[in-house]
Amino acid sequence: MPNASRRVLVLTGPTSSGKTSVACAVSQVSDDLVIINADSKQVYRELPILTSQASCGMLYGYLSVFDEFIPSVASWMRDCADCLESVWAQKGIPLIVGGTPMYLYSLLHGINLLPSLPDCLMRELSEELDNLGPSGFLNRFVCKSGEDLSRFSCDSYKMLRDVAYFLYTGKTIQELYRESSVYKIPYDSIDVVAIIPSDRDSLYSKINERFLEAVNSGAIDEVASVVENKAAFRNRAVTTICGFREIASYLRDEITLERMVAMGQRSIRNYAKRQLTWFRNKFNGIKAFDQPQDAERYILREILL
């Protein structure tokens, strides 16, 4: 790799495309490579099987599902910046690996810095959302505030965030974004390599196989240990992990094992579709490969040498 004290290498692609295997392979060839996680679901230490966490690297499993703190793009950017500074200080090569589109988009283009929300406000609103449900929660807020319903997300996690910001600042999330400053990690250069399989059927087959393997390897026990501790579990972001809600429904005897597997697989396939749409529409100029072995070969021969 050419001399660059603050250079970044990124390896991305949809779920089950082979990113982790490529990252592990190239890190074995180059002792200087340090893997940094860029997957928003692989940060929870209680769910390594369900989220297919890598066995090595930074920012994997470093948070707990029982923490009141809910990670965001901004918090990942701060943590990633700290990791990068640490790797650069040791003359290492950071390899950021993951498929969370907003993490990668913010890494490339920067992020709007929004004010931090008080934990007490988030706890209060989260309890209201639990008691009223998404529709009742939003309708109650709209009735009290007189705000336009269409200005708030229908997704429960984003809805909670949007309402919290409005109550705390008196402004909508859109207004805050327009008024905020942009933070960008100060690297010298960045190389982005993506694995974008053209054979969707093959990708979906791998997704199905991986979720089934996770179910058979302990993912059910992982989710059970989380949902059984209802008093401590308040992190809504965890419930958005593909397969989590389906397994939780199975544990409540609401669906059969076979139905749970099918629903979990479908959830992950739909997520992969959204990832592919992001890569197609938002990430111009990246070096994309159809097969993981081609991406590995390019990294080893064109970037690391």
From Swiss-Prot:
Protein's UniProt keywords contain Transferase: yes
Region annotation Interaction with substrate tRNA: where it falls in the sequence: 39-42
Site label Interaction with substrate tRNA, positions: 100
GO BP field: tRNA modification
Gene3D superfamilies: P-loop containing nucleotide triphosphate hydrolases
Residues the record lists as binding substrate: 15-20
InterPro entries hit by this protein: Dimethylallyltransferase, IPT, P-loop_NTPase
Cofactor field: Mg(2+)
Binding of ATP, residues: 13-20
GO molecular function per UniProt: ATP binding; tRNA dimethylallyltransferase activity
Catalytic activity: adenosine(37) in tRNA + dimethylallyl diphosphate = N(6)-dimethylallyladenosine(37) in tRNA + diphosphate
Pfam families (UniProt xref): IPPT
Keywords: ATP-binding, Magnesium, Nucleotide-binding, Transferase, tRNA processing
EC number in record: 2.5.1.75
Family the entry assigns: Belongs to the IPP transferase family.
Quaternary structure annotation from Swiss-Prot or TrEMBL: Monomer.
HAMAP family hit by this protein: IPP_trans (MF_00185)
Its biological purpose: Catalyzes the transfer of a dimethylallyl group onto the adenine at position 37 in tRNAs that read codons beginning with uridine, leading to the formation of N6-(dimethylallyl)adenosine (i(6)A).
Name of the protein in question: tRNA dimethylallyltransferase
Organism this protein belongs to: Neorickettsia sennetsu (strain ATCC VR-367 / Miyayama)
Gene: miaA
